[in-house]
Design a protein with these regions (language model features):
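Extracytosolic ligand-binding ectodomains
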Residues: 1-356
């Protein structure tokens, strides 16, 4: 629309590397949301996207984030997919007084005035997931995870929860991000025979584990998902589309599934039918989309993209997003989110239970 002013927004997602698949979903969700805002007559401004691709290299996030802020006059950056990349960007946005909008699940135990956490942390994903699974399948667990912050912290939290509730951790193993040599994990699962497996692996490691576990279940009925499921906090609909039947019957927890029945999701999917009809919509896509919507709503409320004013305009105020009507906690900058337990069926997760 002619005459509309523009506010620059940084988009910082990788198109390659071991976590490229979910990162591409985040990128697509953010860019679609920017197109949605710019096409709307409701907003008297445009958002101008500036995208940098760190190519999956954690040490590039800080320099690219700094470049976005200093050279492109960006005050809001939507992006980062891993805790390593987020932690690289934090000192930059804190020093330069910008806001990083982080749209990926993480392990929790972090607060920054310059971050808005637009996805679930452990009390919003892992805790409700274990509360759902243990009474239904048992509390003897095998823990597998990526050998970095996400895997370490989620496994630690799971151990604490299980031990406090009388459960048992039969084994715990880590593999490097992207490592697909996971036969030793399957061998230990076969030996320990847990009630369920908590999968904190990432990307190709997780996909390889699910495929190998499917083969184990075909050889031994004890390891079929209806008897011993794999549960995850970071497995998205955009990922299971390429897994065939390997994910079928296993569980995840998320603040969003495409199959959710709500006025907000109905409106969101109608928007995407026009703007991004080929999208495989999942939580990461919806979270990145929601981050951009929150930026736009806050700018409209305060009349500026200044980080302090935007932060103040959001606190205690509800914003309608694909995730529902959400608000930012004034003390932690975390978004208050529901937890939906889903079971994989075909290319989607069917919602089994919603916990608020």
């Amino acid at each position: 629309m002619a005459g509309k002013i523009s506010f620059p927004v940084g988009v910082l997602f990788s198109g390659s590397g071991s976590y490229a698949q979910p990162a591409r979903q985040g990128f697509r969700g953010a860019m679609t949301a920017i197109a949605h805002i710019n096409a709307s007559r409701r907003f008297p401004f445009n958002l101008q996207a500036h995208h940098f691709d760190p190519a999956g290299e954690a040490d590039r996030y800080a320099s690219l984030c700094r470049q976005l802020i200093r050279e492109r006059d960006v005050r809001h950056v939507v992006g980062c997919t891993t805790s390593w990349s987020r932690k690289e960007a934090i000192p930059v946005v804190e020093k330069l007084d910008a806001l990083l909008w982080y749209p990926c699940v993480y392990e929790g135990f972090e607060v920054s005035e310059n971050l808005i956490y637009v996805a679930a942390c452990a009390n919003q994903h892992l805790v409700p997931l274990l509360d759902y699974i243990a009474p239904r399948f048992g509390s003897r667990a095998m823990l597998v995870g990526a050998n970095y912050i996400w895997g370490w912290e989620n496994n630690r939290i799971a151990r604490d929860i299980l031990h406090r509730s009388g459960g048992e951790v039969l084994g715990e193993r880590f593999v490097s991000i992207g490592d697909t040599d996971i036969d030793h994990l399957i061998d230990e699962v076969r030996e320990k025979r847990p009630d369920f497996i908590l999968n904190n692996l990432i990307g190709p490691s997780s996909y390889a584990f699910l495929r190998a576990y499917q083969a184990l279940g075909e050889a031994d009925d004890r390891f079929r998902p209806e008897k011993c499921p794999i549960i995850s906090c970071n497995l998205y609909e955009g990922e299971i589309t390429g897994l065939g039947h390997a994910a079928a019957g296993h569980f995840t927890v998320s603040c969003y599934f495409r199959t959710l029945q709500s006025p907000e999701n109905d409106s969101f999917l109608k928007t995407l039918a026009a703007l991004d009809p080929g999208a495989i919509v999942d939580a990461f896509y919806a979270q990145a989309f929601s981050a951009v919507v929150m930026i736009a709503e806050a700018i409209m409320r305060c009349g500026s993209d200044d980080a302090d004013l935007v932060r103040g305009a959001l606190r205690g105020q509800s914003v309608d997003t694909p995730l529902g009507a959400i608000s930012v906690d004034r003390w932690t900058n975390h978004v208050e989110l529901p937890a939906h337990i889903g079971r994989a069926c075909g290319r989607q997760f069917r919602n089994r239970q919603a916990l608020t």
